[in-house]
């Protein structure tokens, strides 16, 4: 084997090795992106289920306030006993950048219960949320299932639609949506 043949063989081996390495690296990266998207979807789905549970159980505040405090496209504040202590916590779900966060405020009990002006530290319940101004997280409906404009008065709200668009890489992957309807049980008609 001459030196020229040896160099050609080494060159071919190097090119083939690099090609195989690049091929497997791209497959790994693709599978990693799919795995990340799957994890984000699972977390978002769990967040929607937890939101549904707490919204469904909304009730009158310990202070006597109506069960819904405020309702807009990306922010929903209501009262619910999410920790099963027989006290109605003030709950706020909202979009902060690409994260859904939850805040709660425990009632200050006494002869005239009140709620503090400041919530406890926010908890991130979902990440990689890609909702835009035209894709609200919260949509509201009345008794006849007619949509309500937002922000809306809390009193006609009977049904809430929660929609999350999830995307781990907005430059490459299209949004995947998770949507659910919640009927508030404790609303007097």
How should these model regions be labeled?
Residues 46-67, 127-147:
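Generic detector of solvent-exposed, compositionally biased contiguous segments
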Residues 1-60, 189:
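Aliphatic-rich helix starts adjacent to a transmembrane/signal segment
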Residues 68-73, 96-97, 152-156:
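Short, ordered beta-strand-loop transition motifs
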Residues 35, 71, 102-106, 154-157:
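Calcium-binding acidic motifs and repeat modules
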Residues 73-146:
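Type IV pilin-like appendage domain
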Residues 42, 55-82:
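Short, glycine/small-hydrophobic-rich surface segments
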Residues 84, 114, 127-189:
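Short linear sequence signals and composition-biased patches located at protein termini or domain-edge surfaces
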């Amino acid at each position: 084997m001459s030196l020229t043949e040896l160099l050609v063989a080494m060159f071919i081996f190097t090119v083939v090795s690099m090609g195989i390495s690049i091929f497997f690296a791209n497959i790994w990266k693709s599978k990693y992106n799919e795995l990340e998207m799957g994890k984000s979807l699972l977390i978002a789905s769990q967040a929607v289920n937890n939101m549904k549970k707490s919204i469904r159980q909304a009730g009158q505040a310990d202070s006597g306030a109506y069960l819904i405090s405020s309702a807009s496209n990306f922010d929903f504040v209501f009262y619910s006993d999410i920790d099963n202590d027989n006290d109605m916590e003030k709950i706020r779900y909202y979009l902060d950048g690409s994260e859904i966060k939850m805040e709660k405020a425990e009632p200050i009990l006494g002869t005239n219960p009140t709620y503090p002006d400041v919530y406890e530290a926010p908890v991130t319940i979902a990440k990689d949320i890609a909702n835009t101004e035209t894709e609200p997280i919260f949509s509201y409906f009345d008794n006849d299932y007619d949509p309500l404009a937002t922000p809306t008065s809390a009193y006609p709200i009977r049904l809430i639609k929660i929609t999350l668009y999830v995307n781990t890489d907005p430059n490459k992957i299209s949004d995947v949506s998770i949507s659910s309807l919640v009927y508030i049980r404790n609303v007097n008609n």
